[in-house]
Amino acid sequence: MPWLCYAAGATLNDDIKSRYMDIRVGCGYDVHALAEGLRLVLCGVEVPHTKGCVAHSDGDVAIHAICDALLGALALGDIGKLFPDSDAKYKGIDSTLLLNEVVELIRSKGYSINNIDCTIAMQRPKLRPYIDTMRARLAEVMGIAVERVSIKATTTEHLGFEGREEGVSATAVVLLIEA
């Protein structure tokens, strides 16, 4: 913006930082196939179902989407970069441990989580009975108030892979603030 004047070496970004709180928004998405006989873990909570997620880790699509949103907000890559599925130490790992590590990384960069919003899409089972437990578990793992954690569930009205009960997806949005 040519009409703004800055001291030598100063930038518009410096001006914004000096006047406003630094906030960051991140978006994450994950999907896993479902298969008979596996555990279904969502938001760190085991949900009774005949099918579970096929994955290298425990397959918690919600936590994976949240991790990607957190990492994306600070341009730190994605969950696959930080925890590659080619590394045997992550085989079957509890995704809450991955989330905890991502949250610690975010904090080490000087940011805190203002809030998260996550939507899980699958046809069955109905997730409403588990939502409060999921919110509480995520709040505990991330060290934030449960009021700052929103988890929603939806079906796709029998459309797509979720509707055919072939898989589950999750989308997450996070807001980070400079601590």
Which functions belong to the PLM regions below?
Residues 138:
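Glycine-rich, mobile lid/loop segments that gate access to catalytic sites or pores
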Residues 20-132, 142:
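RNase III-family endoribonuclease catalytic core
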Residues 131-135, 165:
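Short, low-complexity, polybasic intrinsically disordered segments
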Residues 151-155:
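Pyridoxal 5′-phosphate
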Residues 145-148:
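Short acidic capping loops at alpha-helix termini that bridge into adjacent secondary structure
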Residues 162-179:
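C-terminal edge-of-domain segments
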Residues 6, 11-17:
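Short, positively charged and aromatic/hydrophobic N-terminal segments
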